[in-house]
Amino acid sequence: MSRGLGDVYKRQKLDNELNYNGNGCGALSADILLQPGETTTIAFVLGMKYDKEATAIMGRYKNPAITCQKELEELITFWSRRFANFQVKTPSPEFNTMINTWNAYNCFMTFIWSRAASFIYCGLRNGYGYRDTVQDIQGVIHLAPEMAADKIRFMLSAQVNNGGGLPLVKFTHNPGHEDTPDDASYVKETGHPAYRADDALWLFPTVYKYVAETGDLKFVDEVIPFANKEEGSVYEHLKRAIDFSIKRLGRHGMPAGLYADWNDCLRPVSYTHLRAHETLANL
């Protein structure tokens, strides 16, 4: 028990304060009076809807004990099915739970949110980071290959026809009709003034792992639009990602780092480029 939680018990009420950018938590309370041996169920239903929709949703919880139990069972069934594709069995139950449940759950959450809600971004980000999202796909390929394939297609459609990836893929992404870092309108809307060297190069390990896991060799022949114009097969998208790097070499003939953020000076762009060639050859 933390000191703060002890203080809440002493006060017997919450302060209704907003803790911005601190180590906060969400807390809800209710005043109830129970007779000896009596039980009750309290359901906290959280969400944001307009009045009409909210009223309809709240109407489903007139009997919270039954409704919540039913939804809990549905939730357990949902995640059990998601985790079923990969299960490890070792002499350690704790290790099994960590790998089979919590690691898998964290991979799904990262895949779904793509770091769009975090301490770093104060709960807000105006789109998907390209390499972040492509990297995060790898964590669920073995658990939900169909979800992974859909997200790969989405990220391929956020690749510009010059081979580079959009540094930020808007939540309203419209394949074939997007502005790019070459356009002042994109820079103004997203705040990203240039391409990054390695964004599209992360497609290589992700696509390769998907094909290796599923055996779906035809995937590389699927035709997908580019972000701004034109379309091409998955294989063509990968080729253009390599071309993007080849056309942007430094004075020593190695792939240049281009625009960077907080730790990009540490990334081995040339090595990533080399691995991209190797992966394309294997495909």
Where are the regions a protein language model picked out?
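Single conserved hydrophobic/aromatic residue that forms the stacking wall/gate
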Residues: 1-9, 273, 280-283
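Aromatic-rich carbohydrate-recognition surfaces in CAZymes
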Residues: 37, 128-133, 137-148, 152-255
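Short, flexible active-site-adjacent loop segments at beta-strand->alpha-helix junctions, enriched
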Residues: 101, 207, 280
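Acidic/polar, glycine-enriched structural segments that form the non-catalytic walls/loops
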Residues: 7-16, 22, 27-127, 227-235, ...
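Intrinsically disordered, low-complexity acidic/polar segments
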Residues: 51-55, 213, 283
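Extended hydrophobic/Leu-rich segments
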Residues: 8-12, 206, 269, 273
